[in-house]
Regions:
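Glycine-rich nucleotide phosphate-binding loop and flanking beta-alpha elements
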Residues: 58, 81, 102, 124-125, ...
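Glycine-rich, aromatic-flanked loop segments that form ligand/cofactor-binding clefts
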Residues: 133-147
Length: 421
């Protein structure tokens, strides 16, 4: 089985005349079509908003595309908040969901008018002492503990997660914050990662809807929204069926009608934070084969490395690889596709069946649009690659330049340190 890249060999050969490999390339048409579908799938809920997880793809050009479709920003750090502000997001277009939060970041988020989503019960006192009051709109992150399991066998273990509060803490926290002036309350939860099933969001929604009904009864608080967070995944392997966002939206709608409407809570807004689903399939890492090595295994060395895409090295994650121009060639070879870091886990593929790869071939590493460039780092003195946008009209636009040695040495600018290129 195979995946079809959104860029051709001929297009890449033109692109590299201006922008050398490696580079991350994003598909504007795909991003737009998907963002439109998400809005349509949840149009039944008047208050719906997708808060794009900035951590997934922190690029102003991407954020501004999503903004056209009503998306907000889910931020988890000071610099992500600063980026959201610079892109013109303001007020409740920003959700600030962080953990182990420096107090000055609460202040910055509050000054932007962002909705603050508290990760810990002790943060209630922290935020009151820092701001001088409790904001009128506030949210808490819920952790049910135990194991979260779906009928198809997908499971995760919230009880081992550092995030969120217990139900008892949220009940007590809502009571405290209501007494201190909070008027609009929300609940947030993230219970499983990269679920490739239409079942996850509806099941999570039902659990959270039942929780907020109980919260309203116990505390008398006005529940303004339920934030389903992320967790809706993408099919990294070609044998997986992609999620159907319309089926997911309808499943959440069904749970809403079954639980919230009878409780007189049909004004509750639904929020989501689907960074991976919004972007991953619409980005790829384009790299060139520059070496081959024949020892106990067959190796293809490329000009990208884990600095450009960390997921395979960090998690052992599968990313499909297409050799451009050889899409229909038989996969007769078994390769490890590797980068140049001085780490043996710097491998994009291990024992992968691929066509014969020659030096100079261009490889597309699929599904890097989220948590791809964003997770880059500078180990071994490697430099981050450029980010390019394949625009809807077919033209290519640079949306982040490649790093240079000057960037690597920039933080020594306070010393008498000189380098030569």
């Amino acid at each position: 089985m195979r995946k079809t890249p959104f860029v051709t060999k001929e297009q890449v050969e033109e692109i590299v005349k201006t922008y050398p490999t490696p580079f991350h390339l994003y598909d504007e048409a795909g991003i737009r079509a998907n963002a439109k579908a998400v809005q349509e799938a949840f149009a039944w809920n008047k208050g719906f908003r997708e808060y794009f997880a900035v951590k997934a793809t922190p690029n102003p050009f991407i954020l501004n595309i999503l903004k056209e479709y009503g998306c907000g920003c889910d931020c988890s750090s000071l610099t992500e908040l600063m980026m959201a502000k610079a892109c013109g997001f303001e007020g409740e277009q920003i959700m600030f969901s962080s953990n182990d939060t420096p107090l000055e970041e609460f202040t910055f988020a509050n000054n932007l008018g962002a909705i603050i989503n508290l990760d810990d019960f002790t943060h209630i006192q922290c935020i009151e002492e820092t701001l001088g009051y409790i904001p009128e709109t506030i949210s808490c992150r819920y952790n049910p503990g135990g194991v979260f399991e779906m009928s198809n066998g997908i499971m995760d273990n919230p009880g081992d997660s550092k995030y969120g509060m217990t139900k008892e803490q949220i009940i007590e926290g809502f009571k405290i914050m209501k007494e201190k002036g909070a008027k609009n309350f929300g609940v947030h939860a993230f219970l499983a990662s990269n679920t490739v099933t239409n079942e996850y969001y509806p099941q999570l929604a039902k659990q959270l809807f039942e929780l907020v009904v109980e919260l309203k009864e116990e505390t008398g608080c006005h529940i303004a929204f339920v934030n389903l967070s992320g967790g809706v995944g993408v099919p990294y392997t070609p044998d997986q069926e992609p999620n159907d966002i319309y089926a997911i939206g309808e499943g959440v709608h069904k749970a809403y009608d079954e639980v919230l409407v009878p409780a007189g809570m049909d004004d509750v807004a639904i929020f989501s934070e689907m960074g991976r689903f919004m972007l991953a399939p619409y980005g790829c890492l384009v790299t060139q084969a520059i070496h081959e090595k024949h020892i106990y295994k067959e190796y293809i060395g490329v000009d990208a490395c884990a600095v450009n895409l960390m997921r395979p090295a960090m998690y052992g994650s599968y990313h499909h690889i297409t050799v451009l121009g050889k899409e229909d060639a038989p996969c007769t070879e078994t390769y490890d596709v590797v980068g140049s870091l001085c780490e043996n886990n710097d491998k994009f593929a291990i024992d992968r069946k691929l066509p014969v790869i020659n030096k100079g071939d261009y490889l597309v590493i699929h599904d890097t649009g989220a948590h791809g460039f964003a997770m880059g780092y500078s180990y071994n003195g490697k430099l981050k690659s450029a980010e390019l946008l394949l625009q809807s009209d077919g033209n290519v636009k640079m949306i982040r330049r490649a790093e240079t040695p000057a960037d690597y040495f920039a933080t020594f600018d306070c010393f008498d340190f000189k380098f030569e290129q």
